[in-house]
């Protein structure tokens, strides 16, 4: 079928000879761009795991696990991936830490391997140790190698959508472990903090970026409403309500759902716009 064909095309055209994926290719598979990230690998592994689940084709479960292990190798091989910043500013980032939780969780649905739960544990431990900063009631996007607060524009950034996404990744893992209380408490703390930072009390919706010291945010899209933080909040609040039965989370779920469905869909064609201004008008 079509999905299988797309998988074959991806296998043939989207991997460079070193095993690292291209970020963009042409319609007929010629490489356009290759980036220093490994998010393409993570999403490809998730797609292959879901394909294996839908079709029963175990070959794709093995492919997903292979990509996952290769990704871990890339992340741990000194010099393979270009650092975001030169050694002048040693740092670690929230994004890859959190996406590895979801990637490992998706693959674990279709194939068993100890590296998967090990990575989930490693990522959650890193979130606790480095990224959660109670002094700001926030999970920060970028910190020093040992979790140090970096008092710059980038070091102060809170990405509420990312943090809310992390919260439901951890809730999903808590559910997998029979609603593990410690994991659930961690996830709810992140959700509560991030909702407080992210929900726009004036116009509604989850805002793009905040500064943990309430200083001006450098990113020019900082006060916009992108589609994906809203969907992460819709998922996370429903998970929280399922886990706790607390009506607060049901109200939050309804609040963000109503706002998103009132503002993002194209009223004529139904598809969602990707980006809105702060007041909810189409950007």
Show the residue positions of the predicted features:
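Solvent-exposed loop and edge beta-strand segments that line ligand/cofactor-binding
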Residues: 1, 27-41, 84-97, 103, ...
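Well-ordered alpha-helical scaffold segments within catalytic/enzyme domains
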Residues: 1, 43-57, 101-114, 165-179, ...
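Extended ligand-binding clefts on enzyme/binding-domain cores
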Residues: 79-80, 93-209, 251
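Amphipathic alpha-helical segments of tetratricopeptide repeats
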Residues: 12, 53, 69-73, 128-129, ...
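Well-ordered mid-protein domain cores that form the structural environment of catalytic cofactors
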Residues: 11-53
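CBM-like carbohydrate-recognition segments
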Residues: 16-22, 197-209, 218-234, 238, ...
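Short, small-residue-biased leader/transition segments that mark boundaries at the very start
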Residues: 2-9
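Internal, well-ordered domain-core segments that constitute the primary functional module
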Residues: 35-82, 91-93
